[in-house]
Amino acid sequence: MPETFEVVITAIIVKDNKYLILRRSPEKKRFPGMWTVPGGKLESRDFINTPKETKEYWYNVLEKTLRREVREEAGLEIKDITYVTSLATVHADGALSLVISCLARYDSGDIKLQKEETDKAAWVTLSGAKKYDLIDGIYDELSMANEQLAGKRHEWARA
């Protein structure tokens, strides 16, 4: 088993009290054809070429990565990113991931899917999300985000 984790960050995007979910391409190795929220891996290009002398330096690297991933996968801009929960997991192929889930508000743009990643998109209510074949845990994260929007905060629990 590897000693290091890939770092993944995901966005639970809210717009008009609905959440964006995407269906993963049937060709994806992990969770093909299942519904999830946009996100992706932290890559060295997200920070390594930012000189130390800049105002931002290497701060907010997760937020920058999340904005890049949402832009690439869905064509949208997001704002007001806040932490929801985290998950450490071991995939069937033995790879280790640390997944950091965030709540973000829709800012602008029209959905433009990255076809090699996803093939469908839907804006759903929390109850409507139950009708989709979601990756395990996604509904729970949507529920947590929904509670945060209502002014409640808590640690992860099954919805």
Task: Give the ranges of each region predicted by the language model.
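Acidic, metal-coordinating catalytic segment for phosphate/diphosphate chemistry
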Residues: M1-T10, D16, R24-E27
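A short coil-to-beta-strand element that immediately follows conserved catalytic motifs
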Residues: L76-S86
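Short hydrophobic/aromatic beta-strand or adjacent loop that forms the aromatic wall/cage
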Residues: E6-T10, S97-S101, Y139
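Active-site-adjacent beta-strand/loop module that shapes the phosphate/pyrophosphate-binding cleft
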Residues: L87-D110, L149
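Nudix hydrolase/Nudix homology domain
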Residues: G33-W35, G40, S44-I48, S101, ...
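Conserved Nudix-box catalytic region and its N-terminal flanking loop in Nudix hydrolases
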Residues: K18-R68
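A structural signal for short, well-ordered beta-strand segments
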Residues: A11, Y83, C102-A104
